[in-house]
């Protein structure tokens, strides 16, 4: 978490989350960032995830990609977490030039529970295709 690299204006300053805030992402990366605390969906009939994203990654063959997972919020302290569902399994793109809004319904298995969101990123080991990465800002869950 920190300031975005130079040349990428933020939707709302001063911070965002990204793959590497100081340089291009590394080869063979496997990183994740979870929401701090839990999100209460115990009374929810439906829930929508919204966030702003800026994507600049190798999308040749979808080997470099972002993933958004929903985790059981009561099971985050151990070495193993329980996945309740995948919101998006294959976020890719190459230099869109602007922040864009991501919107998706959370899976039914998450409703009625305390949850956490996990934003994961993996990359291949091809040296000629590293890029800035995946940056996320203004995350919110709309509960209905």
Regions found by a protein language model. Name each.
Residues 24-42, 99-103:
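Short beta-strands within extracellular/lumenal beta-sheet-rich domains
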Residues 27, 39-47, 94-96, 109-111:
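Extracellular/lumenal carbohydrate-interaction signature centered on repeated Trp-anchored short motifs
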Residues 28-31, 60-61, 124-143:
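Extracellular carbohydrate recognition
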Residues 35, 41-57, 66, 113-124, ...:
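Extracellular beta-strand-rich recognition modules
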Residues 45-88:
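Extracellular ligand-binding interfaces
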Residues 78-110:
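Extracellular carbohydrate recognition and processing domains
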Residues 104, 108, 121, 134-136:
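Low-complexity, Ser/Thr/Pro-rich intrinsically disordered linker/stalk segments at domain junctions
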